[in-house]
Amino acid sequence: MVKKILLINGPNLNSLGTREPEKYGTTTLKDIEQAAIEQAKAKGSEMAVYQNNTEGFIVDRIHEAKKQGVEYILINAGAYTHTSVAIRDALSAVAIPFIEIHITNVHSREEFRHKSYLSDTAVAVICGLGVYGYTAAIDFALNK
């Protein structure tokens, strides 16, 4: 069983709860992070959480994860999903299995959201399940 998981949230996810609630709901990022920590703890695992709006800081945190012995990464890269070769390369460099998460169904949204730079290297992609996608990703990772 996986003992160390890192949950990364990218740009604008710090605004969950107030940002376009018709798309993203009213659950805050703090609520998601607290639930994630509790879910992992209930299974005897450790959950670290991180959010940043800046691409380079996200890349740095992914590199740190390797040094810290993180065994699984869960990432909602937000808009960087569709633009960031740097985040893709960082995930490939550390070779930590990861799950890509999106609250909305990105395939039913604007065309530019249909391309992910992460999906083809992810263990799984979860989208369109609302914030439950985080719960599902954690459950999957904990049972690896």
UniProtKB/Swiss-Prot annotation:
Keywords: Lyase, Quinate metabolism. Pathway: Aromatic compound metabolism; 3,4-dihydroxybenzoate biosynthesis; 3,4-dihydroxybenzoate from 3-dehydroquinate: step 1/2. Substrate binds at residues 76, 82, 89, 103-104, 113. One of its GO terms (molecular function) is 3-dehydroquinate dehydratase activity. HAMAP family: AroQ. Homododecamer. Adopts a ring-like structure, composed of an arrangement of two hexameric rings stacked on top of one another. This is Catabolic 3-dehydroquinase. It comes from Debaryomyces hansenii (strain ATCC 36239 / CBS 767 / BCRC 21394 / JCM 1990 / NBRC 0083 / IGC 2968) (Yeast). The gene is DQD1.
